[in-house]
């Protein structure tokens, strides 16, 4: 069975005075698409979606594209397929969909991109529209554009999932891409990309800070230590849990981090606490050994990975929303600051060591995060 890496994101296109697709109801559409695509492998297995579904390709010339201005080439086959959904460009026939694509291309070029952001676009009319094509990098996703094909659904009625003919066209396009060697059939792992991970301008007033507040070692009362240095930028972000008590208040969390450091140094004879950063149920991020020093909990990955541990046990129930958001913000921060490579891989502790960490409930969540690799 062919294995697919599907990255799903809601692409929010924002510019004043262009058209109604500037202010989509992203939450509603996102949830629907996540549910729709979550079982895509099962649809293949059950025969609901055939591997050889035919599709009609509309060339750039046919839909009236401006001359392409992109020059960065893709090396084939790529390992990643990034599927987006563009809300607000409703169309159900070739004429209207072509007009919407011309508007979209003009918007992207106006925002200093070299062309329309995607390799291909699938209209709700069931046609596949050529974007920058098979051999050129799109601008659809900062972390994947040089190793992926970016394909976007467009034309759907706001609040609805793509039509059956659009889904069939998408499946046909994917099958064709694999058969022709444009897309690798190697399995990696499904993951979920948020809109802020794309290259699209975020909505005003909703842009996240580059980094969360990190409680420094001096504030939680760390002991001095001298650990081996990291090899930066790290290639991996590894998620763990401490498998002990948790904390929901800053003073509790500071005490817990101190106790954990003492356990590592006194009982395990480690150079310091075993993690680069720790996350509490108070939504706080606590500096462990920090950006530049190695942790001691990820075996042969210590020097090339950032270890982020949730304080507590998360086998049955996951961390709360504040803690999960803090960890995701920290990962984004690491990329922005250059401590983590943009093409990093995210893994659970159990993926690199014989352990139950980070707990099944937490693991089920992180495997939907960007860059996850089992």
Curated annotation (Swiss-Prot):
Glycans are attached at residues 39, 93, 146. Pfam families: Amidase_2. One of its GO terms (cellular component) is extracellular region. The keyword Transcription does not apply. Belongs to the N-acetylmuramoyl-L-alanine amidase 2 family. It comes from Mus musculus (Mouse). This is Peptidoglycan recognition protein 4. Its main location: secreted. Residues 76-212, 233-359 form the N-acetylmuramoyl-L-alanine amidase domain. Residues 1-20 form the signal peptide. CDD domains: PGRP (cd06583). GO terms for molecular function: N-acetylmuramoyl-L-alanine amidase activity; peptidoglycan binding; zinc ion binding.
């Amino acid at each position: 069975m062919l294995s697919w890496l599907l990255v799903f994101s809601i692409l929010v296109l924002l510019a004043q005075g262009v058209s109604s697709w500037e202010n989509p109801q992203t939450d509603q559409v996102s949830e629907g698409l996540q549910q729709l695509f979550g079982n895509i492998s099962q649809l293949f297995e059950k025969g609901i979606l055939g591997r050889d579904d035919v599709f009609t390709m509309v060339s750039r010339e046919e839909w009236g594209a401006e001359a392409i201005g992109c020059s960065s080439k893709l090396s084939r086959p790529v390992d990643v397929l990034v599927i987006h959904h563009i809300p607000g460009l409703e169309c159900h026939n070739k004429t209207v969909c072509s007009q919407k694509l011309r508007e979209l291309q003009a918007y992207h070029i106006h925002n200093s991109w070299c062309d329309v952001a995607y390799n291909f676009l699938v209209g709700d009319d069931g046609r596949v529209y050529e974007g920058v094509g098979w051999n050129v990098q799109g601008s659809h996703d900062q972390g994947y554009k040089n190793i992926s094909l970016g394909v976007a659904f467009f034309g759907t009625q706001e609040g609805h999932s793509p039509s059956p003919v659009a889904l069939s066209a998408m499946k046909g396009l994917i099958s064709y891409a694999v058969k022709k060697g444009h897309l690798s059939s190697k399995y990696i792992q499904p993951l979920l990309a948020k809109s802020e991970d794309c290259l699209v301008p975020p909505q005003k007033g909703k842009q996240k800070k580059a980094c969360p507040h990190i409680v420094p070692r001096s504030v939680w009362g760390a002991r001095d230590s001298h650990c081996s240095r990291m090899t930066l930028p790290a290639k991996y972000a590894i998620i763990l849990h401490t498998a002990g008590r948790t904390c929901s208040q800053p003073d509790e969390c500071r005490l817990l981090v101190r106790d954990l450091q003492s356990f590592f140094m006194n009982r395990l004879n480690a150079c310091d606490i075993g993690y680069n950063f720790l996350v509490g149920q108070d939504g706080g991020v606590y500096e462990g050994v920090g950006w530049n020093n190695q942790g001691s909990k990820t075996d042969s990955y210590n020097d090339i990975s950032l270890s982020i541990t949730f304080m507590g046990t998360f086998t049955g129930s996951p961390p709360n929303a504040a803690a999960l958001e803090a960890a995701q913000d920290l990962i984004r921060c690491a990329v922005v600051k250059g401590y983590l490579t943009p093409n990093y891989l995210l893994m659970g502790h159990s993926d690199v060591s014989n352990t139950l960490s980070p707990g099944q409930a937490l693991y089920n969540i992180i495997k939907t995060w960007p860059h996850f690799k089992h």
